[in-house]
Every structure is written in structure tokens, then in C-alpha cells.
Amino acid sequence: MFAVIVNPVSGGGEAVRLAIRISERIAAMGQESRLFETSGDGDAARQTRAAVEAGCEAVVCIGGDGTICEVAGELCHRDATFYVVPGGTGNDFARAFHLPKDPMAAFESQLAGEPIQIDCGRMNGKSFLNVSGSGFDVAVLEKTEELKAVYPGEKAYRKAVLSVLGRYKAFEAELSIDGGETTHEACTIVEIANGQCIGGGMRVAPDAKLDDGYFDVVVVKKVPRLLIPLLLPMFMMGWHTKIGLARVTRAKTVTMRAKNMTVNLDGKLLRVDEAHYELLPGAVRMKKPRL
């Protein structure tokens, strides 16, 4: 049996209509499905847990990166197969997984695909599937949250970028990778990447792979404020890792410390003083999309 988990506000309400189409497609395969609607923070995880305990062998998540993150966390080391149907604004995990942009095409491509085990990250015990980190991109997300009451999603994000560009300051961080020596650095951005993209397509970790058993740890040290606007086109193209602007290290564990630091966890913002990351290799069962 399939569980179809949907964030009803995702995609301006279009996600619910999409969930009905997905359920009809499952029925056409001769399979049963149950629809679970999320209603708030943490509800996707609770609904996923209930679905698996009810005997669902496949879980379809319709939503953005935040909902996908919650569902994936509950499916770590479970027998259920995870299907992702992009229904958010950024859809960065869907990019990393090379899913078609069309939601139904994305679902069909996974139905036709071969089983695959992908890695999952954890930060202080909380799961993420794509990217976590701190710095410039998090400052933009914080500003976006402030502006959402005035502007719709994408417009709020664009205005937040322009606002943060003019005032962003690097943060002081302590970093330890795979239990090695602790370094003290002024950082513009630090990303612990399982996937490749943040912010709706910025290729912050262009060489990251979801199933290689490693994080790509991307560190951009402090850069002059006048050069910060140049980071955006570099991130979009993935050039920052090619020209020496960023340091990239492959790792299985990372510890980052900074006083009163805000960390992005697949779009969810958390305030911590220490973030300890560990990779769970091959923890989530999926179907590799057949394109």
C-alpha cells in the first residue's frame, strides 16, 4: 500500500489536486493508497511514522524541501520506499535527484526506476536530505521570513537577497572535520552538503552525490563586502569551487561551533551554538528516476 503525504498549502494549494491525481495513478496500477495531509511543523514526520506503522510499503511525499526532509528522516533505515513529487518553491532536492520538473513526470520516472539507497544527514539528531549550513544564505532565509507577510514567496526571497547583500558580515566559526584538528575561521558561508543546490538552484556543492557515502563540506572564507554580489552568479554556475574561492572537503562527520548561530536544515531555521553532523550512508530507500 502507498501512503501519499501532502502539504496542502504547498504550491498555492495545487499539491492537494496533485495528490488526487497520484492516488488515481496508484489505483490504476491495482494498488491501494491512503492520503495524509500535514497541518504544521513536524506533522509530516508524524504522518510518515503512522503510515509505516499501518503497513504502508511506499511513501509518496508531495511538497517542498522542508516536507521532504521530515518524511525522509522517518524513513531512515526503514523498509518503505520513498517517492518524491516536487511541489514547493525551491525544490532543491528534486534537482539533486535529477527529477523532471513536471510533478506527474517525476512520479512516473520513479515508478519506472531501479531501487537505490541514498545517504541521509543528521545535525544534532535532526535529519536532512539535501543541504545544511550557515552564513549568507541563512541570513537571506531569515530576511525572507520577515518579508513573507508583505510579498509572495519568490518575490520575498529576491528582495531579501538584495537587502542582505549590502549589510552581510562574515561569522566566526570553529570547524572540525572527521574528528580532526579544530580550525578557527571567518566564514561567508559553510555548507554541509548531501545534495548540490540551495536557494532554488544555486549549485553550492556542484560535485556532491546523494549516494557516495560522504558530505561535501563547502567553506567560503570571508570576502570583501563589495565582492559578495559576485557570489550569486558563481553559486548559480558552480564556479566558486573551480576558481579557488571555496574550499571543498569530503567528510562523514563535521562539528561547527559559533555563538548563537542560525543553521539551515533543508529550509528549516534552527538556532544553536554547536552543530554536529553525521552521515548515514544508504539510509533511505528510493527509486532512481528513469529519464
Map each language-model feature to its residues.
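A generic structural signal for short beta-strands and their flanking turns/coil linkers
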Residues: 169-173, 186-188, 211-216, 250-252
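ATP/NTP phosphate-donor binding region
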Residues: 1-59, 69
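Short Gly/Thr/Asp-enriched flexible loops that form oxyanion-binding sites at enzyme active sites
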Residues: 67-80
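Glycine-rich beta-strand-to-loop/alpha-helix junction loops that act as flexible
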Residues: 8, 62-64, 87
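Glycine-rich phosphate/pyrophosphate-binding beta-alpha loops
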Residues: 133, 137, 191-205, 269
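Catalytic core of DAGKc-family lipid kinases
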Residues: 3, 29, 77-188
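Gly/Ser/Thr-rich active-site loops/lids in small-molecule metabolic enzymes
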Residues: 148-156, 200, 206-227
